[in-house]
From Swiss-Prot:
Chain ranges of the Guanylate kinase-like domain: 11-189
Gene3D superfamilies in the cross-refs: Guanylate Kinase phosphate binding domain (3.30.63.10), P-loop containing nucleotide triphosphate hydrolases (3.40.50.300)
Signal peptide start and end residues: none
Protein name: Guanylate kinase
Reported function: Essential for recycling GMP and indirectly, cGMP.
E.C. no: 2.7.4.8
A GO MF term: guanylate kinase activity
NCBIfam families named among the record's database cross-references: guanyl_kin
Catalytic activity: GMP + ATP = GDP + ADP
SMART domains reported for this sequence: GuKc
Organismal lineage: Bacteria, Bacillati, Bacillota, Clostridia, Eubacteriales
Domain of life (superkingdom): Bacteria
Entry keyword annotation includes Protein biosynthesis: no
Length: 216
């Protein structure tokens, strides 16, 4: 009897970036709420926990010595120092989740994403775009936390960031969160069906089938 092709159980690493105001956080939250096989990576940091933050949930809180030791052990997909504190994406915990069949989201900035791309070549890199720069402006203004000067700074930063879209595998325009989520779901499904992800399992199933034909 012919064996079934083994299911590809390894999860997919989904790296999501985009300019401030594009809606990255809202999209990631919607994906997490909708799918029980999608998880978000918990970053590590050396900063002190804020009120209500839980170690292992909001961040993995490390001492600077522990963080530097992990850097020496190459245990970060990416890391950076911001205002005297270190932040990074632990490689071992991401790999553990992927091996367990969990799809893992990294919502990180562009520089961090490009560093991850150097180490995680099988990751799926998605850039979230606003429908227009005018819409982006309105979204940022609605937050009510920007001065005219900081608003201009954000716009200049957004223009620069959008130039990096060609470094990503996919671009998703977020004119509607529900539609953007559907597009990412379609991307994830297509990535799961890629031959290079299934190749090892396909070969194993062929070997099992040949063994049955010869010895059964």
């Amino acid at each position: 009897m012919m064996n079934k092709i083994h299911k590809n159980n390894r999860g997919v690493l989904i790296v999501i970036s985009g300019p401030s105001g594009a809606g990255k956080g809202t999209i990631c939250k919607a994906l997490l709420e909708k799918h029980d096989d999608i998880f978000i990576s918990v970053s590590a940091t050396t900063r002190n926990p804020r009120v209500g933050e839980v170690d292992g949930v909001n961040y993995h809180f490390l001492t600077k010595e522990e963080f530097k030791q992990r850097i020496a052990e190459d245990d970060f997909l990416e890391h950076a120092e911001v205002y005297g504190n270190y932040y990074g994406t632990p490689k071992s915990s991401v790999e553990k989740m992927l091996d367990e069949g969990k799809n893992v989201i990294l919502e990180i900035d562009i520089q961090g994403a490009l560093k991850v791309k150097e180490k995680a070549t099988d990751g799926v890199f998605i850039f979230i775009l606003p429908p227009s720069m005018e819409e982006l402006k309105q979204r940022i203004i609605k937050r009510g936390s920007e001065t005219p000067e900081s608003l201009m700074t954000r716009f200049k930063s957004a223009y620069k960031e959008i130039n990096y879209v060609s470094k990503y595998n996919y671009a998703v325009v977020n004119d509607n969160v529900e539609d953007a989520v559907k597009k990412i779901e379609a991307i994830l499904l297509a990535e799961k069906c890629r031959v290079d992800r299934l190749k090892e399992n396909l070969l194993e199933s062929k070997e099992d089938e040949m063994h049955e034909q010869l010895y059964d």
